[in-house]
Amino acid sequence: MATRRLSTIHSLAIVALSCVAIAGCGTQDGSNPAGSALPSAPASAIPGTTEGATTADIQAAKLEPCPVSDANVAPVADGLPDLTLACLGEGKPVRLAGVRGTRMVVNVWASWCGPCKAELPMMGEVYRDNREKLACLGIDMADDRVAALAMAGSTAMTFPSVQDPKSEIRAGLKVIGVPTTLFVRPD
């Protein structure tokens, strides 16, 4: 029991330190540092569709279904933005502002991001070890759906993810670059 508790504490400490390190790479005003423009999503990456992705691609990724969101709750100040994004794996679109009720880690990632590829297996482990106490939601940003599903499968991340091919969450979450990890309160 003590080993498991230490493992959980160790995993959460790594996530927290990663957040601090990543936050230090941006600018104070939330603008892009020189040379850090995010690529645009390919035309085939259309939210709400599986264009380019087969059922086999979705099943191979082994992502858990996206959380159910409440369409009727009002967004909260400094909360998740009021955006509805397509589920990357199986599930209905998710209204970010409507996902509440549990502590949550939100991880913004992309298949073209080298640090994301290194971080996602660890994020998946934290999720599997703490899923009873802590929800996790990935946001695949500025990416191709097929490439994102392939990376999800190759990193064994398993936590549910939504797709944001147009990078709409950048302003609402003050995302400077990827990976970005945020901790969200239940309320």
Language model features by range: what are they?
Residues L96, V146-L149:
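Acidic helix N-cap motif at the loop->helix transition within catalytic regions
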Residues V94-K117, M123, C136:
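Short active-site neighborhood of thiol/selenol oxidoreductases, capturing the structured segment around
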Residues A150-M157, Q163-D187:
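Thiol/disulfide oxidoreductase modules built on the thioredoxin-like
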Residues M1-A86:
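N-terminal targeting signals for export/organelle localization
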Residues L83, V94, V108-W109, M151, ...:
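Conserved hydrophobic/aromatic "anchor" residues
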